[in-house]
Structure formats: C-alpha cells, structure tokens
C-alpha cells in the first residue's frame, strides 16, 4: 500500500509521477498488444498456440486442444453441489428476466401518404464473450454477458477464458452450460480478442466482443474496434473513495479490495482527511 500526504513537500511530484507512470505503461502495452493482434491476424492458429503456451502456460500443440467440448461444460454443471447449481441457475433466470424487458422489437406503420416506415431489429449472428480466468475466475461475467445474448436471439455465442495453470474453473464451465454458450475456448488476453475479431481456422470471427478483462484485453478491444463491435473498454479497474468519517472503515476496505483483486494494474484509492 502506498500512502501520499498532501502536507509533504514533494506531494505534487509524487502524484504527477503516479499519473505519468500509468500513461507510459499504457503506451508500451499498446505496442505489445498491436504486435500480438498482427501475429494472430497473419498466422492464425499457429500464433494463437504460441501465445497460449507462452503467456497462459497451457501445454497445447494442436488447435483442437483449445476448445472445450459441450459435454465438459455439462459435466461441470452436473458435478456442482445443489447450492452452487441453484445459485447459478437463479442468477441466470434473474438476468434472463431483466434482459427480456430490455429487448427491442421492430415496428412499422403506414403514414397518411401511404409510405411504410419502421425499424427492423435483428440479433447479431455471432458474439464473443470474454470471461477473465487468470488471478480469479468470474462465472458472473459469463452469465451477465452470455444470457442477454441468448435472450436477444444471437445464433452463436463463443466464450473465451484463459485456463489458469492449465485448469478452467469448474464454475466458469458450469456457468457456460447454464448460459447456453455454443462454443468455448481456453484462450485469453489480447490473442483471444484478436482471434475473435479476425477469426482463425478454429475460432470463428464474431460480430461483437463483450466482457471485461485486464489491461491487455482492454487495449486489444480498443484496437480491434471498427473491425468488430465491442461493448465498452472495461478495465483496468479504478475506484476513488472519498472518506469523510461517516462510514465504517471495514466497508471502505472491502470496497477497495473488491476492485484491487481484479488485476495488478487495478487502482483502489482512498482520499481522506488528516
């Protein structure tokens, strides 16, 4: 934990250095991400395998090893205890109900001149969902992104999530089954975003990429936007809490921890009075 005091003579220098460091890091990362995207776009599965071995530590030699069979997702769901399964299914049902109210429908009418006017609304054909799987696994990210796509009528939902230490979190697999994911790949980072954006022989190109990720994922989504749609640039997480002494410090600490856990680039700041 780093502590800055506005009473210190070098406070302005410290705060400026803190902000500048983030900008410098972002520039360097953007160049590395661009190289990864170019490699996957140009060499497809071969580059995807190389980056998955080097960055995710997954021992893969064939593109087919990257895909998770639907039966494996279903088995993970069946293996959950009753409470875990009920929690996932209840969450999915609540998200599904909310998304149904959000769903936009087409309409048309005929004006007084005999012209037929209206709006045609069609679901996307294919959507890619990114679910973090490095330092922590987030089955909630699977549900919050895949279930609305299913409600919208998307034909094919592709989930990508890195396998931490060669293992996919069973709750992520189970959430994929609950959410109706059609295909899943154990790939992550900028290379996964590139594969979804441009496609490879194994991973189909999608119309839109959704879901949160670390700085690499955020930078990659920013760079492929235009080639493919994205939801937003989510991450790295930043939160600033202004403490006025009116709240239980434990609550503040929990809020800070909730953001700081996302990745090493997350920033959880507390502004307080001396």
Protein language model annotation of sequence segments:
Residues 8-11, 26-33, 41, 48, ...:
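Generic structural signal for well-ordered, non-membrane alpha-helical segments
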Residues 109-174:
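Conserved small-residue-rich beta-alpha loop and adjacent elements
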């Amino acid at each position: 934990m780093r502590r800055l005091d506005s009473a210190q003579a070098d406070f302005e220098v410290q705060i400026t250095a803190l902000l500048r460091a983030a900008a410098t890091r972002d520039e360097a990362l953007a160049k590395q991400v661009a190289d990864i995207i170019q490699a996957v776009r140009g060499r497809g599965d071969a580059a995807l395998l190389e980056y998955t071995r080097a960055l995710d530590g997954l021992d893969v030699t064939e593109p087919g090893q990257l895909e998770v069979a639907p039966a494996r997702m279903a088995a993970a769901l069946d293996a959950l205890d009753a409470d875990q399964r009920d929690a996932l299914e209840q969450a999915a049902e609540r998200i599904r109900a909310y998304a149904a109210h959000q769903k936009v429908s087409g309409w048309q009418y005929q004006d007084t001149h005999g012209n037929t006017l209206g709006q045609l609304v069609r679901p996307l054909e294919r959507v890619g969902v990114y679910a973090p799987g490095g330092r922590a696994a987030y089955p909630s990210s699977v549900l919050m992104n895949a279930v609305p796509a299913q409600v919208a009528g998307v034909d094919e939902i592709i989930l990508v999530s890195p396998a931490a230490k060669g293992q996919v979190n069973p709750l992520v697999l189970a959430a994929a089954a609950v959410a109706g994911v059609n295909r899943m790949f154990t790939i992550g980072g900028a290379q996964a975003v590139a594969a979804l954006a441009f496609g490879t022989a194994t991973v189909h190109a999608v119309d839109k990429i959704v879901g949160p990720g670390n700085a690499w994922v955020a930078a990659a989504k920013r760079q492929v936007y235009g080639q493919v749609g994205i939801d937003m640039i989510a991450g790295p997480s930043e939160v600033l809490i202004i403490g006025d002494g009116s709240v239980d410090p434990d609550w503040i600490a929990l809020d800070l921890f909730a953001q700081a856990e996302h990745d090493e680039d997350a920033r959880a700041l507390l502004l307080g009075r001396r």
